[in-house]
Amino acid sequence: VKDGFLNCLIDKDPKREGFFMTGGIAHKKNYTYGKFEFRIRMDEDPHKSSSGLGLTWPESEKWPDDGENDIYETAHEDNTWNANIHYAVSGKDQKYQQTFHYNKSDWHIVAMEWTPEYIKIYIDNKLVWDLKDPVAITKAPHHLCFQTEKDINKPFTKALKLQVDWAKVYKYVPKK
């Protein structure tokens, strides 16, 4: 944390030539359903070799069986990001993916509402995706994570960061 932001870095490892350091952090509390919301941005990468993520990951660590909800996953190739909902069919990874054409280096408020009936993705308080496939919606407890990734086969010239200004998690309360 620096200057009031969570900074997940990507940089060259100063102690090991040819290696990179990437950052990540995970919330300790797990939730089954809820709303996950955060204000986030990712540095533009001139070499198109990195990615930043805001996601939920299963408490069980059983992937893909217990799902993965990539709420914000920046693309390596361009200045966009995706939401990916991973789930398993016969133990094999399947996913729904939606691409968003917003500048990833600008600040955005991104949210996911996750209920037994749907997953909804919001960008800057606007609903942009509504997924209602019950097979794809995990019932397993998940926790919020932020992380960075680096394609080691592509060039790298400067440190990059995924920044999070704030994050909120709202507990799911079933309707009566």
What positions do the PLM features span?
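GH16 jelly-roll
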Residues: V1-K176
